[in-house]
Amino acid sequence: MAIVHMKKLRLMVVRRQKDELLRDLMLLGCVQISEPDALLADAESAAVLRQESGNVTEVRSELTRLTAALKLLDKYAPVKSRLLSSRPEVTEADFLDDGAYRQELDAVAQIEELEAAVRRYNGEEAKLRSNMEALRPWQTLDLPLDLGETVRTRISLGMLPAAVDLAEAAKALADAAPESQLYEISSDKEQHYVLLICLKEELTEAITALRASGFTLANLNGAPGTAKQNIEDAQQQIADVIRRREQAETDIAAFAPHRDAFKLCIDRASVKLGRAEAEERLVGTESVVCMRGWLTAPEEAKLTAVLAKYDCAWDLADPTEDEYPEVPVKLQNNKFTEPLNMVTNMYSLPAYGTVDPNPLMAPFFILFYGIMMADMGYGLVMMIAALVALGKMKPKRGSKYFCELLFACGVSTFLLGIVTGGFFGNAVPTIVKMFGHDVKLGILTSPLLDPLTDTTQILIGAMVLGFIQLSTGMVVNMVMECRQGKVGDAIFNEGTWFVIFAGLALFVLKIGNIGGVPVVLCIGVLMLIYGSGREAKGFGKVTAVFGAVYNGLTGWFGDILSYSRLMALMLAGSVIAQVFNTLAAMPSSGGVTVVSMLIFIIIFLLGHLLNFGLNLLGCFVHDLRLQCLEFFGKFYVDGGKPFRPLEINTRYVDVENHNF
């Protein structure tokens, strides 16, 4: 239950064995390859070493194409996803089968061609519909659209704004070109669609006269035939385009049997990408390849066994303290504390060489969650949901941590529900009373702690728990400072407050007073005065003392007061649950009927679903705040870099690895 010890790895291997070695390191999954900056920083090394080039761009393109193809299958051949389904297991040989991978890329290429055809058909349809809509205002015109002129006349189609009076426009036209005629074909809210016939020699005067009213010529591209004929042709073409598009979509859907293979290949491409990126962190010459990285110390024997198969030289060493900021961090915990990795990862990993907070945080986090939720019914729901998810889905990593944490918090919620007598609020007494009975139901009617009546006791208990957790954090910090040789800081920074708190307790209990003077408390105050000003000079000692007293007292008061949220959320959840139970039972106040029972069930289910959802999230957020701000603030040193080894990390399948 600690931060895993890391070893610094330096390795050289003959070039011809590079790919095979990277494959074995990936299967081993315990080596993180570092950036080559340190190797290339030395001028002599940089002169003979060159950075390796992986096919990152190519593999990333393959991953993008596979992902897009899977999305197309989900679009054109959707399937109902099973909520509680586990990931299929594949053998290492099947997962790393290059032949099958290339076959699926060929299938992806065919899907891409079909999708390109679908997009092309969509464009053709959009263009045809646009042309068809442009022709609709002219569909009552019997003249061919390409009839632009006769021997002596010019025929033009155009538009005038709807606000223009056509009679006035025709009069203006007659004044400018007496032999011209203007005919209205159709009108809508925006424009008049008109036909202009004029002598060729009067065309300029006619157009000029109409443009004063906003006239514009229609651009119908000289389509042959009438507008109605062109519309009918467009409709036929659209029908043909739709048919071809639907056929292309059907052809895409026919690749549905490849869905699982695509998922496997997406995982394969993701792993290939990680390997290619790792390869680009290598440097070498024409004959050898060099790398630097980090190894989890417990896996040293496994790595040694793997490297023994290769023509290579390697060196393992412990990192120096100066290198600690660069050392990646991996947390190793037992089954009880492992789920808290999710919480730690959400905040920030601890710095290498410090303390893993999970074993310290786990009992407090789980207990506090149970205090805030405190309902047997809700706890049962959480435990059942977690067990079903773990059994059916067999989740990995983050999802597994979440389910395990949900189960642990469910147990805590159930146990604290026994203390408060909550089972979906006061559901059982409410139902019993609804049927006209008034009986004692043990803890359900006479709980050890009633959130509505024992609020003060619960508040005091919450603050006591807060004091215990904060004191735990200070003890941890004292131990860390002592290990670093900062014994004085441990005594005067943290030890002082323990003496003060002990003195306050003894003073209240009237123990250890000499002549009415609280000796232990006075010693604590003197330690605070000396400790806060021991590094200051002159008048700075005075301000340092006042600052230490003010910041210390207000800081402790504020931190402990934050734990009052334990009582507040317990009270809120209990009250809301009881309110919904009361509302659900009201229709049955005059007697239970079928209708009143249906109303009860509906209100009960909806109300508790809402209350459960709000509390499930709210309790997690507030619990997280107590850990990350109050508790971690007493000892935690963050800033750790996550350990990212070269490994098989998949999303859709689980790979059976029997080699290591």
Indicate residue ranges for each PLM-predicted region.
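Long, charged N-terminal accessory/stalk domains
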Residues: 1-361, 389, 396-399, 403
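Conserved, carboxylate-rich catalytic/transport cores that coordinate ions
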Residues: 2-7, 16-22, 26-33, 300-660
